[in-house]
Swiss-Prot record:
It is a multi-pass membrane protein. GO terms for biological process: intracellular potassium ion homeostasis; potassium ion transport; protein targeting to vacuole; proton transmembrane transport; regulation of pH. Expressed in leaves and stems. Preferentially expressed in guards cells. One of its GO terms (molecular function) is antiporter activity. Operates as a K(+)/H(+) antiporter that maintains K(+) homeostasis in guard cells and could regulate pH. Plays a critical role in osmoregulation through the control of stomates opening. It comes from Arabidopsis thaliana (Mouse-ear cress). Pfam families: CHX17_2nd, CHX17_C, Na_H_Exchanger. The keyword Transport applies. Residues 585-605 are annotated as: Disordered. It is found in: Endomembrane system. This is Cation/H(+) antiporter 20. The chain crosses the membrane at residues 26-46, 55-75, 86-106, 122-142, 155-175, 193-213, 228-248, 283-303, 320-340, 353-373, 380-400, 413-433. Its main location: membrane. Keywords: Antiport, Ion transport, Membrane, Potassium, Potassium transport, Transmembrane, Transmembrane helix, Transport.
Length: 842
C-alpha cells in the first residue's frame, strides 16, 4: 500500500478496528524510538569495557539499523523505516540536536578560552590548519574520482566541507575520553580541552562558511544564485553573533540572576523563557540561511557559566535530550549511511587516504607545535591523538553536506567510517603511549614509620562527598594537628561522580579553572563553593597548608584517582567518609539523651560509595582511615581550638593487637599532643579461656562472602605479633604516658564491653583498628554475620545502626607492605596455633 506524508494520519484506531499501528505516524515513531534506544544502549554496554565514549555505540547503532546491515532486508525497512516516516523522525531528531547544541554552547566558557594562553591557541591553530589544508588536497582527488560530471558539487563548498570534516575536534567527546582516562584535571587534559575549545569555535565558523557557500548551489545543477548571496549570509551570521553577545548575553545574565533565588530553585518561567530563546535563535539562523543549530549553539554561549542557573537548566533538559532525542539523530545518520556504496579498490583506497590524511594532519600538526612550545614529546604525541577525536559535530557537518548535496552517498559513508575509526582508536592509543593514564602507584611507608623519619611533615588526603562532610573532617584533622608537628599538609579531595550527563563535564570545568585541579584560584567576585569555603577558612586560621583537589570519575574507578593522588602527593594517610551518615542532632553525648529516635536512622549516600571505600582499603598505597560520622564537628558538640577551629574533645582508642590497632594508638598519641584533646586508651587483654584454645580461620563459603570479615592471608606468627604489640604499647607509653589515660580490661563478653563504651556519653570519637590480623578476641567474632565487613569486627559492631552508638567512629587500616591479599573468612575453633590460610579443609 503506497503512502505519502500528506495522506498519513497521526494515530490509529487500534488492531480491533482493523488498523495497523505501523501505518500511522505516531505509533510508528514510538516503535522507531524504542528500537533505536534499545540498540544504542545495548552497544554502549558492549563497548564499555573498551572505555569507548557513548557516541561510538550510537554511531555504530545507527549504521546497523540502516542499509549497511538490517536495512538490507527491504521488508524491515519498508515496515519500520518507510520513506514517508523519515521527515517525521528527522524533525524530532532535529529538535534533540537543536537543544544538544545549546548544551554544547553551555559547556564552552569563552572567558576560560581567553585565559587558556598562547600554548593552547598555537596547538589549536596547528591542529586545524594542517588537516584543513590536507583535507582540501584530498577533496580534489575525491571530487575527480568519486563524482560524475553530472553530480559534481562546486569547488568552494566541497573543499570547505572536506577541510572542516578532517580538521574538526569533538569537544564533548574529548572531554568524556579525558575523564575516562583520568586525564581531565591534568596538565595535558587542560591543554587538550583548551585547544579543543578553540577548535570547536573555529569549526562552527568554518561550518557557517560552508553552509553559506553550499546555499549558492553546485555545478551539478540547481538554480544558480549570485555569489553575493553567500556574502550576505556570512555578514548576517556575523551580525547575529554580535547581537547575541552584545545584547542578549547581558540580558541572560539578568535572567540567570533573577532565576536563581537563594533556595536554589530555578523559577519555571525563566526556564521556559530560556528554552523559547533556543527555538527563536535556531529559527533566526535558519532564516538567515545558516543551519538552525548554529543559533542554538550561540545562544548557549550567552548563558552565564558561573552561578547555578546554567547548571540547573542542564539538569532539567539533558537527560531527555541526550538520552532520548539525540540517539534519533545518530539513527537518521545511520539510515543515510550505506557502506555497500564503497565499492571497488578505488573507493576503499579513498577511505584509506581519508583516514590517513585526517590522522596524520591532526597528529603531526599538533605534535610539531606542541614540541615547539616545550611540551614533552610523549605528551605532545598524546595531544595529537586526543585532538583527533571526532563525534557528533563531525556527523552534523556530514549530514548538512549531504542535505546540501555537497556529499554523495559514497563520500558520506567514507567520512562516517573515518570519524568512527579516528574516535575508536583514541582511548587505546592514549592508554598505550601515555603512562600516567595507566594508574600505577608506588607503595609508601605507614604512619608509624613516618613518626621516626618525617615527623616534620604529616601529609593527609581527606576525601569528601559534599558539604555535609566538611565540619567533621576539619574537626578530625585539627585534632591530629599538634604543636609538635612543624607542618601538616592537607590535600582535600572532593569526590564527584562522573555520569553520562553533560553537567558532569561542566562540573569538571568549574573544578579545573584554567587547568588547575579543584582549584584555589577564583576569578574576582566568584562565589566560593560550599565544600572548599570551610577548608579555606581553616587554612587561614591555622598553620595548615590546604590544597583542594577534585576527582571526577565513574564510581567503579574512583579508587584509582584516590590511590593515584595519595601516591603522587606522598601522603601518609587517606581519610574516607563512610557511606552512611547520621544527623548531627543524633551525634553527641553533650546534647543527646537517647541513642535511639529518628536520628539513629543514617542517611545512605549510596552503595556505590561503599564500594569505592572497599576498593581504596584494598589498593591504597598508605594507611587508610574510614570516618563514621555521628555529628563530629557540630558546633554544639565541640570545643574551639586555640586558633578558633573545632576540635574533638574526648577520644577513646580501643586496642586488641595487630598492625591496624598499632596504627590506631599511634594516631591516638598524635591526638594526645593537642592541648584540647583528652585521649583514653583501653587495651583488651586475651581471656584465660582463649589463651589455651587458639582460633583457626578458614575461607568463607562464596555464598556468604559479603557477610563475612576479610583478614590477611599471610601466615601469622602469634609470638611475633605479641612482641610487636608489646613494643608498640611500650613506645606509646614512653612518649605519651603523661598525656593519656591508659586502661586494661579482660572482658567476659567482648561485644557487650564494646557496646558499653559506644553507648556511653564519655567520648566524642572512638578510634579502632580494622583488625585484618586479629587477636584471638577479635578472631572469635569472625563467625558473626557482618553488616559492614569492610570495617572489621569491632568497627562493624560500633557502626551498626541498631546498636545506638553515640560517638563517631574512626576505623584505621595500616598500610600493608607485604602486598598480601585479603580473604573473607568464617571461624572454627581448633587446637592449632593461630593461623589464617587458604585451606578450606581445616
Amino acid at each position: 500500500m503506497p503512502f505519502n506524508i500528506t495522506s498519513v494520519k497521526t494515530s490509529s484506531n487500534g488492531v480491533w478496528q482493523g488498523d495497523n499501528p505501523l501505518n500511522f505516524a505516531f505509533p510508528l515513531l514510538i516503535v522507531q524510538t524504542a528500537l533505536i534506544i534499545a540498540v544504542s544502549r545495548f552497544l554502549a554496554v558492549l563497548f564499555k569495557p573498551l572505555r569507548q565514549p557513548k557516541v561510538i555505540a550510537e554511531i555504530v547503532g545507527g549504521i546497523l539499523l540502516g542499509p549497511s546491515a538490517l536495512g538490507r532486508n527491504m521488508a524491515y525497512m519498508d515496515r519500520i523505516f518507510p520513506k514517508w516516516s523519515m521527515p517525521i523522525l528527522e524533525s524530532v531528531a532535529s529538535i534533540g540536536l537543536l537543544f544538544f547544541l545549546f548544551l554544547v554552547g553551555l559547556e564552552l566558557d569563552l572567558s576560560s578560552i581567553r585565559r587558556s594562553g598562547k600554548r593552547a591557541f598555537g596547538i589549536a591553530v596547528a591542529g586545524i590548519t594542517l588537516p584543513f589544508i590536507a583535507g582540501v588536497g584530498v577533496a580534489f582527488v575525491i571530487r575527480n574520482t568519486l563524482y560524475t560530471a553530472a553530480d559534481k558539487p562546486g569547488y568552494a563548498e566541497f573543499l570547505v566541507f572536506m577541510g572542516v570534516a578532517l580538521s574538526i575536534t569533538a569537544f564533548p567527546v574529548l572531554a568524556r575520553i579525558l575523564a575516562e582516562l583520568k586525564l581531565l584535571t591534568t596538565q595535558i587534559g587542560e591543554t587538550a580541552m583548551a585547544a579543543a575549545a578553540f577548535n570547536d569555535v573555529a569549526a562552527w565558523i568554518l561550518l557557517a562558511l560552508a553552509v553559506a557557500l553550499a546555499g549558492n548551489g553546485g555545478e551539478g545543477g540547481g538554480e544558480k544564485k549570485s555569489p553575493l548571496v553567500s556574502l550576505w549570509v556570512l555578514l548576517s551570521g556575523a551580525g547575529f553573533v554580535v547581537f547575541m553577545l552584545v545584547v542578549i548575553r547581558p540580558g541572560m545574565k539578568w535572567v540567570a540572576k533573577r532565576g536563581s533565588p537563594e533556595n536554589d530553585v530555578v523559577r519555571e518561567s525563566y526556564v521556559c523563557l530560556t528554552l523559547a530563546g533556543v527555538m527563536v535563535s535556531g529559527f533566526a539562523t535558519d532564516l538567515i540561511g545558516i543551519h538552525s543549530i548554529f543559533g542554538a549553539f550561540v545562544f548557549g554561549l550567552t548563558i552565564p557559566k558561573d552561578g547555578e542557573f546554567g547548571q540547573r537548566l542542564i539538569e532539567r533538559i539533558e537527560d531527555f535530550v541526550s538520552g532520548l532525542l539525540l540517539p534519533l539523530y545518530f539513527a537518521t545518520s545511520g539510515l543515510k549511511t550505506d557502506v555497500a556504496k564503497i565499492r571497488g579498490a578505488e573507493s576503499w583506497g579513498m577511505l584509506g587516504l581519508v583516514v590517513v590524511t585526517a590522522c596524520a594532519g591532526k597528529i603531526v600538526g599538533t605534535f610539531v607545535v606542541a614540541v615547539m612550545v616545550k611540551v614533552p614529546a610523549r605528551e605532545a604525541l598524546t595531544l595529537g591523538f586526543l585532538m583527533n577525536t571526532k563525534g557528533l559535530v563531525e556527523l552534523i557537518v556530514l549530514n548538512i553536506g549531504k542535505e546540501k548535496k555537497v556529499l554523495n552517498d559514497e563520500t558520506f559513508a567514507i567520512l562516517v567510517l573515518m570519524a568512527l575509526f579516528t574516535t575508536f582508536i583514541t582511548t587505546p592509543t592514549v592508554m598505550a603511549i601515555y603512562k600516567p593514564a595507566r594508574g600505577t602507584h608506588r607503595k609508601l611507608k605507614d604512619l608509624s614509620a613516618s613518626q621516626d623519619s618525617t615527623k616534620e611533615e604529616l601529609r593527609i588526603l581527606a576525601c569528601l562527598h559534599g558539604p555535609a562532610n566538611v565540619s567533621s573532617l576539619i574537626s578530625l584533622v585539627e585534632s591530629i594537628r599538634t604543636t609538635k608537628i612543624l607542618r601538616l599538609k592537607l590535600f582535600v579531595m572532593h569526590l564527584m561522580e562522573l555520569t553520562e550527563r553533560s553537567s558532569s563535564i561542566i562540573m569538571v570545568q568549574r573544578a579545573r579553572k584554567n587547568g588547575l585541579p579543584f582549584v584555589h584560584r577564583y576569578r574576582h567576585g566568584e562565589r566560593h563553593s560550599n565544600v572548599i569555603g570551610g577548608f579555606e577558612a581553616y587554612r587561614q586560621l591555622g598553620r595548615v597548608a590546604v590544597r583542594p583537589i577534585t576527582a571526577v570519575s565513574p564510581l567503579p574507578t574512583m579508587h584509582e584517582d584516590i590511590c593515584h593522588m595519595a601516591d603522587t602527593k606522598r601522603v601518609t594517610m587517606i581519610i574516607l567518609p563512610f557511606h552512611k551518615r547520621w544527623n548531627a542532632d543524633h551525634g553527641h553525648s553533650h546534647h543527646h539523651q537517647d541513642g535511639g529516635g529518628d536520628g539513629n536512622v543514617p542517611e545512605n549516600v549510596g552503595h556505590g560509595w561503599r564500594l569505592v571505600n572497599q576498593r581504596v582499603l584494598k589498593n591504597a598505597p598508605c594507611s587508610v582511615a574510614v570516618l563514621v560520622d555521628r555529628g563530629l564537628g557540630s558546633i554544639e558538640a565541640q570545643t574551639l581550638s586555640l586558633d578558633g577551629s573545632n576540635v574533638v574533645e574526648r577520644v577513646c582508642v580501643i586496642f586488641f593487637g595487630g598492625p591496624d590497632d598499632r596504627e590506631s594508638i599511634e594516631l591516638g598519641g598524635r591526638m594526645a599532643e593537642h592541648p584540647a584533646v583528652k585521649v583514653t586508651v583501653i587495651r583488651f587483654l586475651v581471656r584465660e579461656t582463649l589463651r589455651s584454645t587458639a582460633v583457626t580461620l578458614r575461607p568463607a563459603p562464596s555464598k556468604g562472602k559479603e557477610k563475612n570479615y576479610a583478614f590477611l592471608t599471610t601466615n601469622v606468627d602469634p609470638e611475633k605479633e605479641k612482641e610487636l604489640d608489646e613494643g608498640a604499647l611500650e613506645d606509646f607509653k614512653s612518649k605519651w604516658k603523661e598525656m593519656v589515660e591508659y586502661k586494661e580490661k579482660e572482658p567476659n563478653n567482648i561485644i557487650e564491653e564494646i557496646l558499653s563504651i559506644g553507648q556511653s556519653k564519655d567520648f566524642d570519637l572512638i578510634v579502632v583498628g580494622r583488625g585484618r590480623i586479629p587477636s584471638a578476641e577479635v578472631a572469635a567474632l569472625a563467625e558473626r554475620q557482618a553488616e559492614h565487613p569492610e570495617l572489621g569486627p569491632i568497627g562493624d559492631v560500633l557502626a551498626s545502626s541498631i546498636n545506638h552508638i553515640i560517638p563517631s567512629i574512626l576505623v584505621v587500616q595500616q598500610h600493608n607492605k607485604a602486598h598480601v591479599e585479603d580473604i573473607t573468612v568464617s571461624k572454627i575453633v581448633s587446637e592449632s596455633s593461630l593461623s589464617i590460610n587458604g585451606d578450606t579443609n581445616v
